[in-house]
């Protein structure tokens, strides 16, 4: 029987075709391509719309228990090496396809309004389309090697998009920082993939899992080696999903245009790391030590990201640290074995965070005519305030996203966060406490952002680009920007209902890894949900007291000065990296240069000097005068006779 899954290969092909078409147009017919910019954007959106329809059909087929589908082509076949490429569709793939395509198409529609007057409008659409293609290809990959290829393509596209405004020094530095930081994780990922191939002779997930089980039965050394290779693979998600200690690139990535910030943080780059851990879950779950390492990496990242977010002044960077914290939740859940809860939170967070970032972009777009185009001003929350009165759609959308991310029922993230905390309570009370505390901090910093930006009195007319007082006020964004906000608002309200614990339709993912569905316990649910909602409300009320009622933020900062300084300086992690890696490498380079000049060059120059002196000496002897030669012969003979006479006198 024919399955819709066999057409899954078309899903990344459509956006790839659009990206290539624009690329060829920009190279060969730049002027005509820029004139037809609106038609190109419509074409890209239409092509991605076809991919979205196919993704939804595949998801529905998987929900209806359609078997997983795999198509493999043997690309390289030798006596001792086999490389296969193709595509693989299972429930995890189906969910990720829908998340990526829905968020991507809404971001593209939003971009049409946000970037309409940017000179790089067409180029940006080409990059976005290629970025989406790379993530879709990664999701469909049937083996580790193919995942690595698309993994690198995702990294390349992020480099291009973060540095899209490359004339800005900050953007140029940010894309380099993201690229270099991710190289650390990618190098570990590559070594881990090659290590597992060396152990098992395969890049296929199921083959690796089966052979590792067999090897572990014979030799404990194989187990330790497998844990090490698993750790190397985990370095890839640590970097890509901005986990501690390779998280430092993510806030700087905010130098790119806001639509790409939404796509990176919601459905593509950072989601790739969680997806890889999910795909490797049957392998990682064989090693308890590795699972504990994953869980604690996520927990530490969650609390660090949350504590840094509470003092951010830049709106987009505050949301960036929020993403870091929520990704920590997902990785922690994977490490605890909460496969479904982690992926459920990935889905709910994707829509809520896309809503928050696009709302932030709409706010920044409204601030630009007042304070100018400098990100230090139009993203500065201290220059905002009361914007909901002037931009009601944007303000209400941001409020819904905030309520969802804080875990307020019945919005989307409440159900997924509650599922993670419920599993954490059973797995480890300490992990539960970290997750519970992070939930309170999440509520505090999110409502802090909301109150600073959308409530109170507008503070932006006190400064503009020319430092002259302005009486302008923000205006609501155009329909192309507000329509995606409305759609994402609906998703942020309703998408979590498919995973409620008393009617969980999301549990079909469980069958991928053969886990049993635990019965619903109303008492446990009320305790976990009540405690998480309680701490969230406490965080919200604390933010209200400080930023709305009292409005004396200095008193709050002085009261908790050590913690405030630690948070404001981002735990000094960037400073430590600057001192060790940047300044350290610079000092090492200077010392190497000095060694090269004084020692290496000195040795080479000394050799040349010796050659020069000896050649000059020989040249003075070989002067062509016969009397000089006779004199030299006589002198040599006399010297030999003198030595001989001395020798014989000593003997006698």
From Swiss-Prot:
Highest taxon of source: Eukaryota
GO-annotated molecular function: NADH dehydrogenase (ubiquinone) activity; quinone binding
InterPro entries linked to this entry: NADH_UbQ_OxRdtase_chlpt_su5_C, NADHpl_OxRdtase_5_subgr, ND/Mrp_TM, NU5C-like, Proton_antipo_N
Topological category with respect to the lipid bilayer: Multi-pass membrane protein
UniProt entry keywords in alphabetical sequence: Chloroplast, Membrane, NAD, NADP, Plastid, Plastoquinone, Quinone, Thylakoid, Translocase, Transmembrane, Transmembrane helix, Transport
Pfam entry (one): Proton_antipo_C
Predominant localisation class: plastid
Disulphide bond pairs: none
GO cellular component terms attached to this protein's record: chloroplast thylakoid membrane
Entry EC no(s): 7.1.1.-
Places the protein is found: Plastid, Chloroplast thylakoid membrane
Catalysed reactions, as listed in the record: a plastoquinone + NADH + (n+1) H(+)(in) = a plastoquinol + NAD(+) + n H(+)(out); a plastoquinone + NADPH + (n+1) H(+)(in) = a plastoquinol + NADP(+) + n H(+)(out)
Residues annotated as transmembrane: 9-29, 40-60, 91-111, 124-144, 147-167, 188-208, 225-245, 258-278, 289-309, 327-347, 354-374, 395-415, 424-444, 482-502, 526-546, 630-650
Gene Ontology terms describing biological process: ATP synthesis coupled electron transport; electron transport coupled proton transport
Keyword Thylakoid: yes
Gene3D superfamilies associated with the record: 1.20.5.2700
Subunit structure comment from the entry: NDH is composed of at least 16 different subunits, 5 of which are encoded in the nucleus.
Family note: Belongs to the complex I subunit 5 family.
Protein task: NDH shuttles electrons from NAD(P)H:plastoquinone, via FMN and iron-sulfur (Fe-S) centers, to quinones in the photosynthetic chain and possibly in a chloroplast respiratory chain. The immediate electron acceptor for the enzyme in this species is believed to be plastoquinone. Couples the redox reaction to proton translocation, and thus conserves the redox energy in a proton gradient.
NCBIfam families in the cross-refs: NDH_I_L, PRK06590.1
Annotated protein name in UniProt: NAD(P)H-quinone oxidoreductase subunit 5, chloroplastic
Annotated organism of origin: Mesostigma viride
């Amino acid at each position: 029987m024919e399955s819709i899954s066999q057409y899954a290969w078309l899903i990344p092909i459509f956006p790839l075709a659009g990206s290539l078409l624009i690329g060829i147009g920009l190279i060969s017919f730049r002027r005509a391509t820029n004139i037809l910019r609106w038609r190109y954007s419509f074409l890209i959106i239409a092509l991605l719309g076809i991919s979205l329809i196919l993704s939804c059909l595949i998801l529905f087929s998987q929900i209806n228990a359609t078997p997983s589908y795999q198509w493999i082509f043997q690309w390289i076949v030798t006596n001792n090496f086999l490389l296969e490429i193709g595509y693989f569709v299972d429930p995890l793939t189906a969910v990720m396809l829908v998340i990526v395509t829905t968020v991507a198409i809404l971001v593209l529609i939003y971009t049409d309004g946000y970037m309409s007057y940017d000179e790089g409008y067409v180029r940006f659409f080409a990059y976005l389309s290629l970025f989406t293609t790379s993530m879709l290809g990664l999701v469909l990959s049937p083996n580790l090697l193919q995942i690595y290829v698309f993994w690198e393509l995702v990294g390349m596209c992020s480099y291009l998009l973060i540095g899209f405004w490359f004339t800005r020094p900050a953007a140029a530095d940010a894309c380099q920082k993201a690229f270099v930081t991710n190289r650390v994780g990618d190098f570990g990922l590559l070594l881990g993939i090659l290590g597992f191939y060396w152990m098992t002779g395969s890049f296929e997930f199921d083959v690796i899992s089966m052979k590792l089980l067999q090897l572990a039965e014979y030799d404990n050394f194989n187990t330790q080696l497998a844990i090490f290779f698993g750790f190397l693979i985990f370095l890839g998600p640590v970097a890509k999903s901005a986990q501690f200690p390779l998280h430092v690139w993510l806030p700087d990535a905010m130098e790119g245009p806001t639509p790409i910030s939404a796509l990176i943080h919601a459905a593509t780059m950072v989601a790739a790391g969680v997806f890889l851990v999910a795909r490797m879950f049957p392998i990682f779950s064989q090693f308890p030590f590795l699972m504990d390492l994953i869980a604690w990496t996520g927990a530490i990242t969650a609390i660090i990201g949350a504590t840094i977010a509470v003092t951010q002044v830049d709106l987009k960077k505050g949301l960036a640290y929020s993403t870091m914290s929520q990704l920590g939740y997902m990785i922690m859940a994977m490490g605890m074995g909460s496969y479904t809860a982690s992926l459920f939170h990935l889905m709910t967070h994707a829509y809520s965070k896309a809503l928050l970032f696009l709302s932030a972009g709409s706010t920044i777009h409204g601030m630009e005519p007042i304070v100018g185009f400098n990100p230090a001003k139009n993203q500065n929350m201290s220059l905002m305030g009361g914007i909901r009165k002037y931009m009601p759609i944007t303000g209400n959308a941001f409020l819904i996203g905030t309520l969802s991310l804080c875990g307020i029922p019945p919005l989307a993230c409440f159900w997924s966060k509650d599922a993670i905390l419920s599993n954490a309570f059973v797995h480890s009370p300490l992990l539960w406490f970290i997750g519970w505390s992070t939930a309170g901090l999440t509520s505090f910093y999110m409502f802090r952002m909301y109150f600073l930006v959308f409530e109170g009195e507008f503070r932006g007319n006190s400064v503009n680009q020319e430092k002259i007082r302005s009486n302008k006020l923000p205006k609501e964004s155009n329909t192309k920007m507000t329509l995606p906000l409305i759609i994402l608002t609906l998703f942020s309200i309703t998408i979590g209902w498919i995973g409620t614990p008393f009617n969980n339709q999301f549990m079909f993912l469980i069958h991928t890894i053969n886990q049993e569905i635990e019965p619903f316990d109303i008492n446990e649910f009320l305790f976990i949900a009540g405690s998480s909602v309680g701490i969230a409300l406490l965080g919200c009320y604390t933010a209200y007291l400080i930023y709305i009622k009292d409005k004396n933020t200095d008193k709050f900062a002085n009261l908790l000065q050590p913690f405030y300084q630690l948070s404001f300086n981002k735990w000094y992690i960037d400073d430590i990296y600057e001192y060790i890696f940047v300044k350290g490498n610079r000092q090492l380079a200077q010392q190497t240069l000095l060694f090269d000049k004084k020692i290496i060059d000195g040795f080479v120059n000394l050799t040349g000097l010796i050659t020069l002196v000896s050649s000059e000496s020989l040249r003075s002897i070989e002067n062509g005068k016969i009397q000089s030669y006779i004199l030299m012969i006589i002198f040599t003979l006399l010297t030999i006779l003198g030595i001989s006479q001395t020798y014989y006198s000593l003997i006698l």
